[in-house]
Swiss-Prot record:
Native species: Glaesserella parasuis serovar 5 (strain SH0165)
Record keywords: Amino-acid biosynthesis, Histidine biosynthesis, Hydrolase, Methionine biosynthesis, Multifunctional enzyme, NADP, One-carbon metabolism, Oxidoreductase, Purine biosynthesis
Residue sites binding NADP(+) per the record: G166, A167, S168, I232
Assembly and interaction partners: Homodimer.
Gene: folD
Name this polypeptide is given: Bifunctional protein FolD
Amino acid sequence: MSAQIISGNKLAQQIKTQIFEHIASYVQQGYRAPGLAVILVGSDPASQVYVGSKRKTCAELGIYSESYDLPADTTETQLLSLINKLNNDEKIDGILVQLPLPEHVDTTKIIEAISPDKDVDGFHPYNVGRLCQRIPTLRACTPYGVMKLLETTGENLYGKHAVIVGASNIVGRPMALELLLGGCTVTITHRFTKNLENHVRQADLLVVAVGQPNLIPGEWIKENAIVIDVGINRIGGKLVGDVEYEAASQKAKFITPVPGGVGPMTVAMLMQNTLLAYQRHINP
């Protein structure tokens, strides 16, 4: 048996087409275009690639974007001042600060400084708290994208045992909340978890987001499981995920590829959040 591939490229394109049509309709009615401010501190190569992709997508969809490429020695105070300015800028609906930030900057303080209704990354404690209380508004982009991918499988998530490998604030923790909201019984594993293999083997739905190439052997996958691989790792010029893809796809019912799985969805859901924030600003 070979798993059905869950294509993020295909779904992301459909979502972006819908966003483009919505924006075109608003502009045709005389409204301004949505505005997204993208802040990059330093010159981390991976961050530059991600930011470039986000800016390109904005241009394709008709979203007005402002770029702030700041030197690595930018102070926390300077960054907070810029965020405050953007919070009060009427033409900006979303503010994105590309992570990771330099060590001398307190990431938590920066995230908390962004107005919750402009927090299109979905990282602000207010937005995470709303998800926790089952009233989500702006949701963390990667977990939100994963939920959209799961919808395309047609599988009923109610009662499925979902196992998440990785407990980061960006993916693992909000992913657990999304799956809980989706009706799953959720197990979160992390660096202190004992006997990871035992947990993975029980997963009807496995989400792996660690950033270690081929961390999960294919033989650990439960028959007919759904496998969502969030990891993106470069080995010898090739991109691979956190799951041993070939072996896993022989046991799973559905699996996301790397690349072309979760990655494109993260950017698509960022644009979706930007549209949502915009709609709330023009129709409060």
